[in-house]
């Protein structure tokens, strides 16, 4: 998206989040098993049809709340922090639930590095901290963190489409993806079939 956020402020807030919030997958299953998750709004789909409401962790993160509620001009639904450890892969998959057909997924990279690749629809992207990205999670997508030592942390939020958010998408640079045979080989591991969680 043609907007950015203050990544240093976000990192400072998240660093102060009590450690008790971390250490689980936040109810996420399947291809998401490698990542830790802290839900800020709503619950993982695998936990059932639970209400989309603020969770306790969000009360510790006023700047992230501002990003969710004021910076993106649309109604927020589920939001989470997703920590992908070094050397991990989120296998390419398609999010199929009806919920995903009604929402737009936005990524806020908090920490990342040059060895993290987001795959989507046959192209690979590097999402840098402070940038804000839209991801078509109804298409094949996955993540490779090729550095065994460094993790990647994103805030991932789903929003209901609004005219203002659609206008931001229209102004976005859509030519940033590239083919990368090495990344795709590691993501797919010789398989061509996508997972459907």
Regions of interest found by a model, annotated:
Residues 1-72:
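Non-heme Fe(II)/2-oxoglutarate
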Residues 76-79, 103-107, 115, 140, ...:
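Extracellular structured ligand-interaction cores
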Residues 81-99:
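Conserved short histidine dyad/triad with adjacent acidic residue
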Residues 92-93, 116-118, 135-136, 140-148, ...:
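Short beta-strand His + acidic residue motifs that chelate non-heme Fe in jelly-roll/DSBH
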Residues 103-109, 132-134, 148-167:
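A short hydrophobic beta-strand segment most commonly corresponding to one strand
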Residues 109-128:
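A short beta-strand-loop-beta hairpin characteristic of the jelly-roll/cupin
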Residues 126-138:
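Short secondary-structure subsegments characteristic of cysteine-rich extracellular domains
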Residues 160-197:
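Long hydrophobic alpha-helical segments typical of transmembrane helices together
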């Amino acid at each position: 998206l043609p907007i950015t956020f203050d990544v240093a402020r976000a990192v400072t807030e998240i660093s102060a989040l009590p450690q008790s919030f971390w250490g689980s997958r936040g109810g996420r299953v399947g291809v998401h098993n490698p990542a830790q998750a802290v839900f800020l709004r709503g619950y993982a789909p695998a936990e059932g049809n639970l209400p989309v409401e603020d969770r306790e962790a969000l009360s510790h993160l006023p700047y992230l709340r501002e990003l969710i509620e004021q910076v993106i001009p649309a109604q927020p639904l589920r939001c989470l922090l997703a920590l992908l450890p070094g050397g991990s892969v989120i296998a390419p998959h398609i999010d199929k639930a009806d919920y995903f057909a009604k929402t737009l997924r936005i990524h806020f990279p908090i920490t990342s590095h040059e060895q993290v690749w987001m795959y989507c629809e046959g192209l690979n992207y590097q999402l840098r901290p402070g940038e804000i990205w839209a991801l078509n999670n109804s298409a094949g997508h996955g993540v490779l963190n090729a550095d065994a030592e460094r993790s990647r942390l994103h805030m991932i939020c789903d929003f209901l489409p609004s005219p203002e958010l659609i206008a931001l998408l229209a102004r976005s640079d859509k030519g940033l993806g590239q083919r990368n045979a090495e990344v795709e080989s590691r993501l797919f591991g010789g398989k061509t079939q996508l997972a459907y969680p």
